[in-house]
Amino acid sequence: MAGKSPEEQHPVKAYGWAATDSSGILSPFKFSRRATGDHDVRVKILYAGVCHSDLQSARNDMGCFTYPLVPGFETVGTATEVGSKVTKVKVGDKVAVGIMVGSCGKCDECVNDRECYCPEVITSYGRIDHDGTPTYGGFSSETVANEKFVFCFPEKLPMAAGAPLLNAGVSVYSAMRFYGLDKPGMHLGVVGLGGLGHLAVKFAKAFGVKVTVISTSTSKKGEAINDLGADAFLVSTDAEQMQAGSGTLDGILDTVPVVHPIEALLGLLKNHTKLVLVGATMGSFELPILPLGVGRKSVVSTIGGSTKETQEMLDFAAEHDITASVEIIPMDYVNTAMERIEKGDVRYRFVIDIGNTLTPPES
């Protein structure tokens, strides 16, 4: 008799919402999770952030996912079971799971605390885990992960407003830290005022950095300055404003998740500085070489953050009262939320109330 598949051997029944084809429409879905291993933490999911990457992944815009796919990179809940060798978490603790649940643990990236760049990184959904089964994300009743990829969620942080820190938060935090854009007194430009952009402003201000928000939308000026504490605002389609800002920035974080012109942005940079593209932008940018060369400017990119950076970011956020500005939604609103994300109709992040609104499928 043929042996059971690894997935059939999973004893823990779970449920969530999954995309089953490239329409990206999510619907109720039953599946199973593995038993809690010696180094694992089982998490009852209470809140899950919804990000632009979830929309792209559900539709398989990147061409690298299979179905069914349960999204969710920003997961917060409580530990319900811990393995015998787990040391940093106990049952009942507030915990979080971000964009990764595994890596090889042996390569140069892993041994230097850069697991998100491991060639064998296992993301929280849409990948194959070490046991040969697909990973399913946070739009679900529970999850289980190796304790290395489970984070202690500070008591001071509210769960719902803190959930987006697990992807959006660490993405901008890691970019600022790694590229040295976190020094007090620096002048940083933040392009885009969405999920990543609004958190970039909050972290930058906590670092003591002067912030200019750059947007195509004049209506966001009040939000940027009055609500988020930015120091200045530039309309990127206003040639006079952009000229006035020429050569004033020590760096730029570009958080816009779609391809857009960047030549005018390069003009805002001082010489010998960089524009950092943050996040999983699809497509290719047109890169003007001469404006880069004459000022020795750089265009670089980053995505996500390591486990070490993620825990540091959560602790820093708790210390400085940094949370996302969120709209809390029920599970069955998720498809409408995805549509609104594509239209830019959210201030600034959707978070699903998993604990109170996710119910088991009827059949």
UniProtKB/Swiss-Prot annotation:
Cofactor note: Binds 2 Zn(2+) ions per subunit.
Applications (biotechnology): The strictosidine aglycone-producing AJM7-DeltaHYS yeast strain expressing pathway genes of the VOM module, RsGS, SBE (GsSBE, RsSBE1 or RsSBE2), RsPNAE, RsVS and RsVH, accumulates vomilenine. Additionnal expression of pathway genes of the AJM module, RsVR, RsDHVR, AAE (RsAAE1 or RsAAE2) and RsNNMT, leads to the production of ajmaline. Ajmaline is an anti-arrhythmic alkaloid commercially used as an efficient drug for the treatment of arrhythmic heart disorder.
Involved pathway(s): Alkaloid biosynthesis; ajmaline biosynthesis
Keyword Nucleus applies: no
Temperature dependence of activity: Optimum temperature is 37 degrees Celsius.
SMART domains per record: PKS_ER
Cellular localization per UniProt: Cytoplasm
pH-activity relationship: Optimum pH is 6.
Domain Enoyl reductase (ER), first and last residues per copy: 24-352
Cofactor(s) required, per the database record: Zn(2+)
Enzymatic reactions: 17-O-acetylnorajmaline + NADP(+) = (2R)-1,2-dihydrovomilenine + NADPH + 2 H(+); (20S)-19,20-dihydrovomilenine + NADP(+) = vomilenine + NADPH + H(+)
GO terms of molecular function: oxidoreductase activity, acting on the CH-OH group of donors, NAD or NADP as acceptor
Enzyme Commission number(s) of this protein: 1.3.1.73, 1.5.1.-
Tissue expression remark: Mainly expressed in mature roots and, to a lower extent, in stems and leaves.
Sites where the protein binds NADP(+): 53, 193, 195-196, 215-217, 220-221, 278, 280, 302, 349
Binding residue positions for Zn(2+) 1: 51, 54, 74
Described function: Alcohol dehydrogenase involved in the biosynthesis of ajmaline-type monoterpenoid indole alkaloids (MIAs) natural products, important plant-derived pharmaceuticals used in the therapy of heart disorders. Catalyzes the conversion of 1,2-dihydrovomilenine to 17-O-acetylnorajmaline, an intermediate chemical in the biosynthesis of ajmaline. Also able, with a lower efficiency, to convert vomilenine into 19,20-dihydrovomilenine.
Oligomer status and interactors: Homodimer.
UniProt-recorded name of the protein: 1,2-Dihydrovomilenine reductase
Organism for this UniProt entry: Rauvolfia serpentina (Serpentine wood)
